Structure formats: structure tokens, C-alpha cells
Amino acid sequence: MTVPVLRTLSALRSATREWHLAGETIGVVPTMGALHDGHLSLVAAAKSACDRVIVTIFVNPKQFNKASDLASYPRTEEDDARKLARFDVDAVYAPDVSQIYPEGFCTNVSVAGMTDVLCGAHRPGHFDGVATVVTKLFTQTSADKAFFGEKDFQQLMVVQRMARDLDIPIEVVGCPTIREEDGLAMSSRNLLLSDRARTMAPRMHEIMQEAATALGQGAPFDALQATALRQLTAAGFTDVDYFELRSCASLSLLDHASVPARLFAAAWLAGVRLIDNIDVPVAR
């Protein structure tokens, strides 16, 4: 099966109008392409929950802080289409920039508070770019449900808050992080890792797991954080952006796992920024 690739908003709306008139529900999986099994798990979740599924592929320039980062982002549309054909996806929406940000576009969607920490603190404007493009994709697709991975947990929370605050009639569904056999969280950026860096990358997850186990046993976070930072440096990671314990509900900083919490980490390895987060058991 060949998946229809829609390039224009008019083509997209023609399809979604027909589906809604037939009483069918629509699920959307927003991506920037370079699809891996993590993305495909979102597609599978959408297929099980909705009558029709749209996968969007759009490398959003507004969420990149560096032009070089945007230029180097993997683009593999033909391979992506082959992968999606196996899932009987109803449409791929792959617009060019003019369909998302037409000439004169001057609106910015910003979610205050939770975008000032973690990745937001190190990538100024990143989540404004995310919130803006996702708002556009939600309104353009008229989807009933949207599927995001917990691997980008902060992004998931930002999108859920944005949809709630703006009364967008869509359910934002979070899906579990999918990992490689060695524990590395699947990410399109993993394609940028050298062979040597790829063998080093899983150490971040191992360090996080060790800290999470100790937190669940009641250990205070400050000593664990200091140890983790030393371990990451020893493992070859540079410029650790953060290694923090935060509330699942509000992203507020915690010093003990006294409430539902997650560990968040971001660090650079051989020029590639890797991020991860894991659930932490409430301390006994």
C-alpha cells in the first residue's frame, strides 16, 4: 500500500472533512520525520484508538536555536513513507513552510512557567516554536486525539497545557518511551551519533536508573545529583545541561521522591545533545 502524501492545507482539509462527515474519529501523530520505532509505537496507539490516522512530517524551523542544528536534522521522507505503509496510515501531511507559516505570519503561542525550566532554560524560544506549530497542526488536522511520546515529557506537558488553556477540542495522549535493547531512548538524533558515541550513549540511562533506585529507597537527591554529574563526565558526556528531579504534575524541583516524580537529564555527547527522563518510585 502507498500512503497518500498531502502537501497542502486544502488537500488535508478535503480529506478530514470527508472523514468527519462519515462520523469517523481522527488521530494525529506530529513528527519531524526520521521515523524510528518510538514514532511507530505512537502510530500503533493512534491506529488502535481512532478510525483514521494522520502522521505529520514537518521539520519546524521555529523550534531550532541554531541554524546548523536545523540544517543537520535528518530528513528521510521516502524511508518514512515505507515504514508508515506497514501501518496502513490514512495520510501523511508533509507541508512546506508556506503552508504552516505563510508570508506575514506573526503569531506566537507561548506557555508560561513550565517552559522556563529543563530544555526551555537551555533552548530559549524552543517551546514557543513547539506550541505554535502544534497549535497549527491541531487546527489544520481537526484531529480528535494526538499522540506524543513521554521521551519528551516536558513537551508533552506543554502541549497538554496549551490545548487545555486554548480550549482546543483534542485529547493529547502520552505514550511510553521506546528504548533500544541497550536502554538508549529512541530518538531521530541518535542517527547523528558516531559509532563510538553510540556505544557510549546508553550510560546516561544506566546512571539515571541507579539514581532512581536510590531515590525510591529514600535517598536525598543532592548527593545523588553530584555523583551522577561526575559519572556522566567520566562516561564522556560534556556540557551537562541538567540532571534534575522534578514533580510529574508541575515540573517543580524536588529534593526527595516524596511525590510522583521523574528524573530528567540532558547532556552533549560528541556534539549531539541527548535527553532522557524516567519515572521515579515514591520513596518508601
UniProtKB/Swiss-Prot annotation:
SUPFAM superfamilies: Nucleotidylyl transferase (SSF52374). Pfam families: Pantoate_ligase. It is found in: Cytoplasm. Keywords: ATP-binding, Cytoplasm, Ligase, Nucleotide-binding, Pantothenate biosynthesis. InterPro entries: Cyt_trans-like, Pantoate_ligase, Pantoate_ligase_C, Rossmann-like_a/b/a_fold. Its EC number is 6.3.2.1. Gene3D superfamilies: HUPs, Pantoate-beta-alanine ligase, C-terminal domain. GO terms for molecular function: ATP binding; pantoate-beta-alanine ligase activity. It catalyses: (R)-pantoate + beta-alanine + ATP = (R)-pantothenate + AMP + diphosphate + H(+). The keyword Transferase does not apply. Beta-alanine binds at residue 63. Pathway: Cofactor biosynthesis; (R)-pantothenate biosynthesis; (R)-pantothenate from (R)-pantoate and beta-alanine: step 1/1. One of its GO terms (cellular component) is cytosol. (R)-pantoate binds at residues 63, 155. GO terms for biological process: pantothenate biosynthetic process. Its main location: cytoplasm. The active site is at 39 (proton donor). ATP binds at residues 32-39, 149-152, 178, 186-189. Belongs to the pantothenate synthetase family. Homodimer. Catalyzes the condensation of pantoate with beta-alanine in an ATP-dependent reaction via a pantoyl-adenylate intermediate. The reaction proceeds by a bi uni uni bi ping pong mechanism. This is Pantothenate synthetase. It comes from Roseobacter denitrificans (strain ATCC 33942 / OCh 114) (Erythrobacter sp. (strain OCh 114)). The gene is panC.
